[in-house]
Amino acid sequence: MAQHTVYFPDAFLTQMREAMPSTLSFDDFLAACQRPLRRSIRVNTLKISVADFLQLTAPYGWTLTPIPWCEEGFWIERYNEDALPLGSTAEHLSGLFYIQEASSMLPVAALFANGNAPQRVMDVAAAPGSKTTQIAARMNNEGAILANEFSASRVKVLHANISRCGISNVALTHFDGRVFGAAVPEMFDAILLDAPCSGEGVVRKDPDALKNWSPESNQEIAATQRELIDSAFHALRPGGTLVYSTCTLNREENEAVCLWLKETYPDAVEFLPLGDLFPGANKALTEEGFLHVFPQIYDCEGFFVARLRKTQAIPALPTPKYKVGNFPFSPVKDREAGQIRQAAASVGLNWDENLRLWQRDKELWLFPVGIEALIGKVRFSRLGIKLAETHNKGYRWQHEAVIALASPDNVNAFELTPQEAEEWYRGRDVYPHAAPVADDVLVTFQHQPIGLAKRIGSRLKNSYPRELVRDGKLFTGNA
């Protein structure tokens, strides 16, 4: 594999020599950093099983190498990488997989290790959504996830990825992660804090990642990380699991942050060793039981993961003085909910008891039941999925609901050809050789729902959201 020139400050190299265990070679570290990062994907098991995905993609000649810590994760090599971007494949557009760096699959693996089955989870720094979508898949869209993102510009990307992957159990918030300890104390069974960091582990993806690096900056970042982990720990219920992770390599932002938490709450913090997380995990194991992944160990990004348990309650933080404001939704009454459920089922949309109908003016929404305890405590940017808008003639079903709830086996499902599916993704109407009978048509490709169309004569009127429409070359090879 070709090499690329990485910028290394001298002080960084000195720090790495001191931080690296004697069992590892510093020359191997430098060599690994100079190699471009291997690409990796994670199969979205909410949409397709790993076995079916491998069968579906077998004709493409992709080389898929299993990732040891994530059974649905694979390193991927494609001979036609330049001909068609991975994100323009049909399987990516329909949410069958997520392009995710291999080491970033580690935190969620740790969160669910040893049979842990949390029902209410928070992802404190969630964008662009790789870990939130991984958590949702592990929960099988049940329970509830609070996915928070401080950066306003990244919340939109987070929602787009959640929607593409067919996820229904997520609530989005846009806050500084330091507010949650006071706002929602002891409310979560599990919390993932993939903390903002100096990014020392990402040089294989970004050779200039360390251009602005300094020891002083690391110390400032670590101070913020201590505040974030303290807040997260307060939001965790006693008995709950907290996973702390970064994509950086210095001890100040990693081990030291976790040790600070234990020193602060010595009777409430228990480190849960990760040496048995997957075969070979002991190669990255620290004396505290954390995983400190230098890039040469598994030929991936540099990463750090710690798992801990909250063994008892800790003193509460002062109650916040802000007002959340009135919640603009009201629950739909049972009789009306039954009528809506029946109408939705007629176009192939079904949901279970984990979701409950709420209404705002003419909008119908489905919220995860597990998030209702947080209503009135935090302000949501977006909650659950928008099911429909009501109008005089019935319901206007929403695209995100189709992707999350539709059964491709519905009687009104209509399978498109590759050329027709590509036209659909370009936002164009489709003219099939034999038009379906129904007026409301669940459009599928590769037996996956990709939208809802209105039949007008021999034409299927496109309802694909304008913001998702794709230009350029797609999966049939036509521009």
Swiss-Prot record:
Pfam annotation, one family: Methyltranf_PUA
SUPFAM superfamilies the record matches: S-adenosyl-L-methionine-dependent methyltransferases
Active site: 247 (nucleophile)
CDD domains: AdoMet_MTases
GO biological process, any: rRNA base methylation
Annotated Gene Ontology cellular component terms: cytoplasm
InterPro entries: Methyltr_RsmF_N, MeTrfase_RsmB-F_NOP2_cat, MeTrfase_RsmB-F_NOP2_dom, Nol1_Nop2_Fmu_2, Nop2p, RCMT, rRNA_ssu_MeTfrase_F, RsmB/NOL1/NOP2-like_CS
Gene Ontology molecular function terms on file: RNA binding; rRNA (cytosine-C5-)-methyltransferase activity
Binding site for S-adenosyl-L-methionine: 125-131, 149, 176, 194
Main location as per UniProt: cytoplasm
Catalysis performed (reactions): cytidine(1407) in 16S rRNA + S-adenosyl-L-methionine = 5-methylcytidine(1407) in 16S rRNA + S-adenosyl-L-homocysteine + H(+)
Domain of life, per lineage: Bacteria
Function description: Specifically methylates the cytosine at position 1407 (m5C1407) of 16S rRNA.
Family recorded in the similarity comment: Belongs to the class I-like SAM-binding methyltransferase superfamily. RsmB/NOP family.
Annotated protein name in UniProt: Ribosomal RNA small subunit methyltransferase F
Species, as recorded: Escherichia coli O6:K15:H31 (strain 536 / UPEC)
